[in-house]
Amino acid sequence: MRLQLLSDLHLESEPFDPVPAPGAELLVLAGDIDSSWAGFERFRGWPVPVLCVAGNHEFDRRELHQAWPALAQHCARCGIRLLERESLVLRDARGRSVRFVATIRWADFDLFGTTQRAKAMRAASYFQRVMRATQDGAPFDAAAVRGEALACRAWLHHALTQPGEPADATVVITHFAPSLRSGDPRFGSQSTTASFCNADDDLLPLADLWLHGHVHSRHDYHVAHARGRTRVVCNSRGLESRGEARSFDPVLTVEI
């Protein structure tokens, strides 16, 4: 199956016209498409099915529990399937079955280990300062983000380790990155990187392909393990005004 991958388009702040990639059988949107949600209309009538995981900015200035069903309904009206802690099996043109396992996978701030967690959470003022989201009326701060992240992690681990519908390949889709290897090279191992990447390296062997967004840099690497190799790909556009979109490929396709 040939997948087109886009993320971090930030259509609420910069113009960008997405186009279908030649030969793609499916479009994957890995979050932060448009904080206003208006940009999802760009994908109405897309020539192939569209799967999406939400990004953190899809919740800017919103109440988390109210936003989830509203976003799912909005995406559905645009012909987009929003997935959150859901698995879905699709078949490609050759009849091969591909299982998609998807969640936003918020940051749990354990990227650098439990001893550095408090420092990483203090550095995560970003979530309150920029998002200004709420959860049950309270600020969606670092502690609340971690709570959601742990629930995502538990679900993801269960989905990848328990028998499910048989499939020829498994693709994980998250917004937050699964490894420090996907960290933005501009920031390296700063504490703030734990707001963008998780230490999900132990889950990588359970997938054939892992697609993510969130970091405004591109990544395409393989991780070798006893089961073989897992490919990790991020095709984040980022903000052109900051020079982040220079190597972004608007028609990138990934074969699985």
Regions found by a protein language model. Name each.
Residues 1-52, 59-67, 132:
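N-terminal active-site segment of His-dependent metallophosphoesterases
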Residues 1-4, 88-102, 121, 169, ...:
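Beta-strand-turn-beta hairpins that frame and shape the catalytic cleft
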Residues 5-7, 27-32, 51-56, 81-86, ...:
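Active-site neighborhood of phospho(di)ester-bond hydrolases with catalytic His/Asp-centered motifs
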Residues 10-15, 34-39, 57-67, 89-93, ...:
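Active-site environment of divalent metal-dependent phosphoester hydrolases
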Residues 44, 82, 88-97, 154-166:
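Short amphipathic alpha-helices and their capping/turn segments at secondary-structure boundaries
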Residues 51-58, 63-123:
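A basic- and aromatic-enriched beta-loop-alpha substructure that forms the phosphate/nucleotide-
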Residues 73, 77-78, 94, 184, ...:
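Binuclear metal-dependent phosphoesterase catalytic core
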Residues 101-171, 176-187:
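Active-site-proximal loop/helix segment associated with metal-binding centers of metalloenzymes
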